[in-house]
Amino acid sequence: MNYRTLGFTGIKVSEIGLGCEGFVGRGEKFAAELMNAAITAGINCLDLYSPDPDVRSFIGNALHGRRDDFVLQAHLCTVWQGGQYKCTRKMEEIVPSFEDLLARLETDYIDIGMFHYVDSPAAWREIADGAIMKYAQELRKSGRIRSVGLSSHNPKAALAAVESGLIDVLMFSVNPCYDLQPGSEDCEKLWADESYSKKLLNMDPEREKLYETCQRRGVGITVMKAFGGGDLLTGDSPAGMALTPVQCLHYALTRPAVAAVMSGVHSLEELKENLAYETAADAE
């Protein structure tokens, strides 16, 4: 496994990490098997956006006794209500959810605390100028989070956050098809068929500027949607042909400032396919 430094944070992460989607609805036995297999392979980082109490508890149990060897990127602004995930900007919901996160993970700190799903410049301004940012800074000062980050699908919002100097890490959707698309506050457009009805040949300049700015300012990028939610791996891929996991991983990991791809694997076989990147020949 190759390891990279996450921007100026000094945090070393495996270039292949885990997303949390594959843990949802699978039970504690599967969570333990997946975490054990990942750790054995050298994976040392995980993105946890889900507020699902079972997922949080299962991951906490799986990390018992080895928490300090693992990098947790976990999200503020997500809550569990009525058995459903919800994105929120209400402090009366954010604070209890964060306390629940720490308790279920059996830890007293999160390595990277992420502002969740910030897909418009207005949403970023609301966070940057308000109580949520103050809360994150208080958590950082007390050591309960070590670095501050943000997740986004929109290069405009992400660039505003990066240029503000208020975040250390950006989680962004990176793959060879999304990178052709202009920024939008509606992330659904990234995977809508009509967005690819016309042939697009060049990287969107706003995305290119975002990656270069992250590199220059030392903001590390962790990647989501490297496989486009699986769409890029099928014959109906907007790329015009099915790409392989290795090709998608290689694309993401060769963008400026990218340190790790957080892959939401749903099986041990999918994990194995991703890990094949570490030993793949250049021709693959």
Give the ranges of each region predicted by the language model.
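Beta/alpha (TIM)-barrel catalytic core signal, keyed to glycine-rich beta->alpha loops juxtaposed to Asp/Glu
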Residues: 118-284
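Active-site mouth loops of central-metabolism enzymes
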Residues: 16-29, 79-95, 121-125, 233-242
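Conserved, mostly hydrophobic/aromatic
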Residues: 6, 18, 46, 59, ...
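Structural motif corresponding to the early beta-alpha repeats
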Residues: 51, 65-95, 115-119
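Active-site groove signature of glycoside hydrolases
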Residues: 100-124
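Short, acidic/polar
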Residues: 26-38, 89-106, 152-160, 243-251
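N-terminal binding-site loop/beta-alpha segment at the start of enzyme catalytic domains
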Residues: 1-74, 141
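Short, well-ordered coil/turn segments that N-cap beta-strands
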Residues: 11-16, 42-44, 66-71, 106-111, ...
